């Protein structure tokens, strides 16, 4: 409240008490600034580089070089949103915050002139362009971090940008416009609240460490249990005690299980090395996980359809959304670190019941052929066929598996098929899809990175029934009947289903409970480095199409 009052008073002095500036003087100086952009492709105000060098000339030329930020309330709204940038994991310094504050203070002392006012107007416009763009798209370009990124950025025309900007200025709705730039979905707003909470915890000293040592088990006594209670109390609330704070009683066990669940650990109630490691992750690291997750959401969630599927890679879960609300979820297995499941978006168009599996060349060369050489009956045991490029079957007794192998190998439909009873296809260049698996026991593991990159689904027939529920003649009974027939059957979806394969290591559920996941593919570090680095970005001359 005090900061807002100071800014308001400063702006009042700036607008109404500062030395008068004639329109002609300001317009001429602004014209020279715009000419500099045209001549050099860049502009610096003081020590602050201007990013929106393609948008700014069009804006000011269209206004005959008149200043924009000349009405009470506009600057306060912009500064308020920039001041809230840390809630989004962003840095106010990226938006000229201190440079603007300094110039406003100077103006309030009556020490400013026409040139300073023009430069302040440019800084404010550039700050607006920066914060609007980064709230919507993120600070970093994901294509610089992930070579297989396929979610495109769509921009509106210059005229749309300027019309929206000027409309927000005219209607006094600048703050609302900027707030609407951020993703309007619960998963984002919940993380914003969690980030505020964790920053407050950090300011209060964070949480205590739990000393390493032997596995702590329910019923035991140890001085470390007292430390454990203190640590859990910070994030999970006070842990009841029966009178002995060093006793690992039932209340401690239940608190440990809740913590393990939230951190994707084996929920056994024991405090072993993995649990101690998770308990002792510094709060600053957890804050960075939230910041990285917010940035990823800004990259992804634009123009999201009402119905879609999210495969949460780091969380090992698949979610089906109806009307943008979670409708169904199941556990999944994802790629091993050296077979990392990629992040991308595509459209699911069909599914196959009782699929065959044509073994990919890499797996064929590294795993299948060596297994055949070791065991002549391997093909029969695995229900596999040797095939030509046209799909016709070759008698394996005529094949020299120790020499050059010009064929493929296909696993036929059946209970032992690596793809199980169904696969879900969303054509993509990475050959990734959802499928059933005979390896059901692995779903009981807390960390489930076991596949070669595709996504194994725990309850695939339930998913098939949900996707086909509006397709005439395809109820669950028919699905089961086709599966029992062991006959390969392709079923086309009436409407394509958007599929997102996403990766984030922090998430908050509808009850406000945050969960942290292991960064299994070591992807967070580059994002945090980029968020902490100086702003290095040229804003586009267009605004995101979804803000038109």
Predicted feature locations:
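Bacterial N-terminal signal peptides
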Residues: 7-16
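Well-ordered beta-sheet/strand-loop patches within structured domains
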Residues: 20-51, 55-56, 122, 126-130, ...
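Cationic-aromatic interfacial patches
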Residues: 23-158, 162
């Amino acid at each position: 409240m005090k900061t807002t009052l100071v800014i308001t008073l400063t702006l009042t002095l700036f607008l109404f008490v500062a030395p008068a500036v004639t329109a002609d003087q300001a317009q001429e100086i602004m014209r020279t600034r715009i000419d500099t952009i045209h001549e050099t492709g860049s502009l610096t105000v003081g020590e602050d580089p201007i990013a929106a060098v393609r948008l700014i000339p069009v804006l000011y030329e269209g206004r005959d070089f008149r200043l924009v930020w000349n009405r009470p309330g506009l600057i306060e709204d912009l500064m308020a949103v920039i001041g809230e940038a840390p809630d989004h994991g962003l840095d106010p310094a990226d938006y000229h915050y201190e440079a603007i504050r300094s110039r406003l203070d100077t103006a309030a002392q009556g020490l400013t002139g026409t040139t300073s006012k023009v430069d302040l107007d440019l800084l404010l416009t550039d700050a607006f362009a920066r914060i609007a763009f980064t709230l919507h798209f993120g600070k970093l370009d994901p294509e610089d971090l992930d070579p297989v990124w396929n979610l495109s950025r769509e921009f509106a025309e210059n005229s749309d940008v300027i019309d929206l900007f000027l409309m927000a200025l005219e209607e006094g709705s600048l703050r609302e416009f900027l707030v609407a730039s951020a993703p309007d979905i619960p998963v984002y707003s919940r993380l914003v609240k969690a980030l505020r909470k964790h920053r407050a915890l950090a300011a209060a000293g964070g949480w205590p460490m739990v000393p390493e040592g032997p596995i702590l088990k329910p019923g035991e006594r140890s001085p470390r249990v007292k430390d454990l209670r203190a640590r859990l109390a910070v994030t999970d609330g006070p842990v009841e005690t029966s009178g002995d704070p060093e006793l690992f009683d039932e209340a401690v066990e239940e608190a440990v299980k809740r913590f393990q669940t939230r951190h994707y650990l084996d929920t056994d109630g024991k405090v072993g090395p993995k649990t101690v490691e998770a308990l002792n992750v510094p709060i600053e690291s957890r804050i960075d996980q939230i910041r990285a997750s917010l940035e990823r959401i800004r990259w992804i969630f634009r123009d999201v359809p009402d119905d879609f599927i999210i495969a949460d890679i780091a969380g090992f879960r698949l979610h089906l959304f109806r009307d943008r609300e979670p409708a169904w979820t199941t556990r999944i297995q994802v790629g091993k670190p050296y077979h990392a499941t990629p992040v991308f978006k595509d459209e699911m168009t069909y599914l196959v019941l009782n699929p065959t599996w044509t073994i990919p060349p890499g797996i064929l060369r590294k795993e299948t052929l060596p297994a055949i050489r070791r065991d002549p009956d391997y093909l029969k045991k695995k229900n596999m066929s040797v095939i030509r490029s046209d799909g016709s079957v070759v008698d394996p007794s005529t094949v020299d598996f120790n020499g050059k192998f010009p064929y493929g190998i296909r696993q036929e439909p059946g209970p032992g098929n690596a793809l199980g009873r169904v696969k879900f296809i969303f054509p993509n260049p990475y050959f990734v899809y959802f499928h059933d698996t005979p390896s059901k026991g692995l779903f009981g593991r807390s960390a489930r990175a076991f596949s070669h990159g595709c996504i194994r689904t725990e309850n695939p027939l339930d998913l098939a029934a949900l996707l086909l529920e509006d397709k005439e003649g395809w109820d669950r009974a028919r699905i089961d009947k086709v599966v029992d027939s062991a006959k390969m059957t392709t079923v086309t979806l009436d409407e394509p289903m958007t599929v997102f394969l996403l990766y984030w290591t922090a998430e908050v559920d509808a009850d406000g409970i945050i969960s942290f996941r292991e960064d299994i593919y070591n992807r967070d570090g580059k994002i945090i480095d980029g968020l902490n680095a100086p702003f290095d970005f040229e804003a586009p001359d267009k605004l995101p199409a979804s803000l038109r």
